[in-house]
Amino acid sequence: MKTLNRRDFPGAQYPERIIQFGEGNFLRAFVDWQIDLLNEHTDLNSGVVVVRPIETSFPPSLSTQDGLYTTIIRGLNEKGEAVSDARLIRSVNREISVYSEYDEFLKLAHNPEMRFVFSNTTEAGISYHAGDKFDDAPAVSYPAKLTRLLFERFSHFNGAQDKGWIIIPCELIDYNGDALRELVLRYAQEWALPEAFIQWLDQANSFCSTLVDRIVTGYPRDEVAKLEEELGYHDGFLDTAEHFYLFVIQGPKSLATELRLDKYPLNVLIVDDIKPYKERKVAILNGAHTALVPVAFQAGLDTVGEAMNDAEICAFVEKAIYEEIIPVLDLPRDELESFASAVTGRFRNPYIKHQLLSIALNGMTKFRTRILPQLLAGQKSNGTLPARLTFALAALIAFYRGERNGETYPVQDDAHWLERYQQLWSQHRNRVIGTQELVAIVLAEKDHWEQDLTQVPGLVEQVANDLDAILEKGMREAVRPLC
C-alpha cells in the first residue's frame, strides 16, 4: 500500500500565501480543511506553510507526505443522517521547524505573496516569556516569534503598507487577537524596535479575534487499518472530526472578499464583536452539557450519545435549552434556535463516545460560568426560577455524593469542593444537617459564586425540594415531571 506523496498522488498545488503556527489535529481539520474547500471552489489559490512552534520531532513532519493528508468528517448532517466524508487535503505545501530551520522560517517574511497568519499554540501559547530576546533563534514564546517575523517583513519591504498581514489566532482564550497584538507590541517596545515598525504594526496589519468550534477527534487509532483499506493508501496523518464547524472572526468586512467567502458558503461569520457568539456557545453548548451530565449520569447513563437517545433525558435537555436558556440570550431568536438544533445534533453524533464523567470535571465552576447567569436572568425577568436549570443545580449537588446504585465513582474538582462535599454529605447521612441546611451552606459560598445565592428568592427551598426528590425517588423518577 502506497503512502501519500505528491508524486504518486498528483493534483493541485497552490502558491504559498498562508503561514500557520501549529501542526496539530485541530488546525488541520478546521482551518486547512476550509482553505482546501475554498481553493477547490474559488480562486483563493492559497497554499499553507506549517511552522512547528515547539522543539519536538513527534509526530513526524507533514513534509514526509509532501503536506498531504486525509480528513474524515463524520457525524449527523443537517437532515439528521449519519455521514462520513473522506477528503484528501492539498492546501498544505510543507512543514518547517522553527528550531532546526530558523533561516527558512525568517525567509517566509520575504515572500511578497504571504498574506495570512493562522495559529493554534494551545491556551498557554499566547503568553509572555520574560527571557525572550530579539536575537534568539528562535525566541521561546509564540508572540515573540511572531514579532521577530513581522519585523523581518517590515525590514525586507521597507515598511510597505501593502505588505502587512491578517493575523487570525485560533487559541481558546477570550479576544485572542487583542491578546496577541498586545504581546507583539510589548516585545516590539521591550526590544526597542523602531517607532516606524510600531506604526506599521498598527496601520498595515489586522489582528482578528476568533471563536472556533469543532470537535476534532484526531488520529483514529482503533480504526486505521479499516479506513486505510477503504482509502487505498497509507496515511500517517489521518484526522477525524465532527460534521459541525463554526468559525467566527472579528475583523474588517473586506476579509470576506479576501478569503473568497462571498464565492463559496462556509460556516464562517465576519463580525464586529465575537462576544455574543461566545456567550451563545457557552450558554447553549457548554450549558447544555453541564445541565445534562449530573442528571443523565445519575439516571444510569454513561455517554452523551446514550443520554440524547433516552427520550426523557433528551426532552429535559431540549426544554432547558429552548424554554430557559434561549429566552434570556441577546441574539436573534432564529439564530439561537438554529445553533441549538445543531448542538443537539452534535450531542447525538454516533461517531463520538463522549463520557459523561470526563465532562463532569470541575462541575462547580462550570455551573457558575455556564448556567448560573441564565438561571439568574430567568428569575429576574419572570419572577420565577427556571425549573430545569434549578433542578440541574440540585442534581449537581447530588452528584458530589460520589455514589450511583451503591457503587462509587471518581469526582474531579478542586480540593476545596471535594473536602466540603465529603463533610456535608457525611453530616447529612448522620442526620447532623438536613437537606435544606446542606443546600444553604453550598449556596452561601460567596468566594465561589461571587455572590450569596441564599439571597435569591426561593432558590434554597426549590433546590432542597428537588434534591429531596432525587434522594427519595431516584433521578429518573425525580426528573420525569420536567421532561
Swiss-Prot record:
NAD(+) binds at residues 18-29. GO terms for biological process: D-galacturonate catabolic process; mannitol catabolic process. Pathway: Carbohydrate metabolism; pentose and glucuronate interconversion. Keywords: NAD, Oxidoreductase. The keyword NAD applies. Pfam families: Mannitol_dh, Mannitol_dh_C. It comes from the Bacteria. Its EC number is 1.1.1.58. The keyword S-adenosyl-L-methionine does not apply. Coiled coil: none annotated. GO terms for molecular function: mannitol-1-phosphate 5-dehydrogenase activity; tagaturonate reductase activity. It catalyses: D-altronate + NAD(+) = keto-D-tagaturonate + NADH + H(+). One of its GO terms (cellular component) is cytosol. Belongs to the mannitol dehydrogenase family. UxaB subfamily. PANTHER family: ALTRONATE OXIDOREDUCTASE-RELATED (PTHR30524:SF0), MANNITOL-1-PHOSPHATE 5-DEHYDROGENASE (PTHR30524). This is Altronate oxidoreductase. It comes from Escherichia coli O7:K1 (strain IAI39 / ExPEC). The lineage of its organism: Bacteria, Pseudomonadati, Pseudomonadota, Gammaproteobacteria, Enterobacterales. The gene is uxaB.
